[in-house]
């Protein structure tokens, strides 16, 4: 598998990032291990999770990190994995939080659950819109210098706060984000393309879209109203089943048939 570098880092990754929010939610530990084994056997090495996955199950999260940690311990392959996790999301115990206090607490909890001494890529998962950019970046500076994190990245933050982050980092010699994880797929393109794509280019960021399959809609398994009642996620993605969504599915069918592939692969 040909690998590429995440921009402005020495992290080499295969060009598909596995999102681990299903671990401990729709996949139990055994099923998660099977998926991770197949992923690694395919030559892939980039795994993404978050400290709060899946908080909607138990109220606080942590299951995904624990499962990935157990898998790496069993496989003894931590050195082969580029590991990303996140901080800042809400749970039933607290709201969105990227304060220094929360980051310093959360990184240690993530390291313990993952059974590792460092995170390769640490994301601002959500912006709390209260904490100053300088406070957040100074927390990252501290944990990078402590060897707990190698590089930082951003996900659900506004274009304005992303710009401010680079300005503050430059002015105060603080760490800069090296990647952006935007919400982007074939049925939800506009926000990234109009608000973020130019910033990705300006700041030399790598981009790793989440929900690239629109939570499963673009796999093609949802073809009728009844299909949405058959899965845990069906209710939340039924919104895509409109004229636009159906047109995208039709286009995926044509392209996948032409190339003897699957809709999910094309998407």
Indicate residue ranges for each PLM-predicted region.
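N-terminal small/glycine-rich loop or linker at the start of catalytic domains
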Residues: 7-24, 82-95, 118, 123
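Short, well-ordered coil/turn segments that N-cap beta-strands
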Residues: 11-16, 43-45, 77-81, 115-120, ...
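N-terminal binding-site loop/beta-alpha segment at the start of enzyme catalytic domains
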Residues: 1-79, 145
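Conserved, mostly hydrophobic/aromatic
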Residues: 6, 18, 32, 47, ...
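Active-site mouth loops of central-metabolism enzymes
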Residues: 20-30, 90-104, 126-131
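Short, acidic/polar
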Residues: 27-40, 98-114, 162-167
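Active-site beta-loop-alpha junctions enriched in small/polar residues
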Residues: 21-23, 52, 86-90, 124-127, ...
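Beta/alpha (TIM)-barrel catalytic core signal, keyed to glycine-rich beta->alpha loops juxtaposed to Asp/Glu
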Residues: 131-267
């Amino acid at each position: 598998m040909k690998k590429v570098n995440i921009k402005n880092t020495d992290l080499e990754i295969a060009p598909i990032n596995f999102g681990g929010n299903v671990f401990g939610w729709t996949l139990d530990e055994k099923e998660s291990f099977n998926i991770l084994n197949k992923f690694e056997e395919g030559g892939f090495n980039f795994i993404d999770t978050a400290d709060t996955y899946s908080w909607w199950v138990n109220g606080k999260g942590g299951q995904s990190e624990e499962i990935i940690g157990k898998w790496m311990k069993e496989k003894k392959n931590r050195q082969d994995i580029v590991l990303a996790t996140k901080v800042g999301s809400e749970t039933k115990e607290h709201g969105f939080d990227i304060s220094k206090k929360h980051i310093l607490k959360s990184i240690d909890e993530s390291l313990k659950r993952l059974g590792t001494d460092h995170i390769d890529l640490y994301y601002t998962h959500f912006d709390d819109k209260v904490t100053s950019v300088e406070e957040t970046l100074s927390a990252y500076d501290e944990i990078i210098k402590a060897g707990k994190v190698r590089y930082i990245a951003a996900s659900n933050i506004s274009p304005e706060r992303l710009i401010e982050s680079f300005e503050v980092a430059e002015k105060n010699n603080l760490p800069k984000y090296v990647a952006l994880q935007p919400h982007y797929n074939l049925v939800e393109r506009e926000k990234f393309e109009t608000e973020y794509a130019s910033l990705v280019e300006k700041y030399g960021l790598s981009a790793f879209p989440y929900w690239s399959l629109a939570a499963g809609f673009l796999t093609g398994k949802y073809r009728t109203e009844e299909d949405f009642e058959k899965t845990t996620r069906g209710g939340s993605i039924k919104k895509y089943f409109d004229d636009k969504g159906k047109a995208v599915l039709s286009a995926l069918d044509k392209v996948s048939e032409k190339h003897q592939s699957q809709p999910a692969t094309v998407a």
